[in-house]
Amino acid sequence: MIIVDQENKTILNNYIEIFINDSADCMNGILARTLDGTICTLGEYARLSRTQMVFNEIVEAYAKGISVFNMPKE
């Protein structure tokens, strides 16, 4: 489960930041920047995390305007 501070839209640890790359198609245009600075597409992140639910929750939250997430540690 992704927990987001609704007021500040941030959380204390293990962040990823989601942002849009307008030059790419929809799925590959949603990028994830992890706390260590790694950037990958959201699809790649979901595969790396091996959790489709995480991917779905990110997409839902992003649609609500939330772009910084506290990701569960494996």
What are these regions (language model features)?
Residues 1-74:
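Eukaryotic intrinsically disordered, low-complexity regulatory linkers and tails enriched in Ser/Thr/Pro
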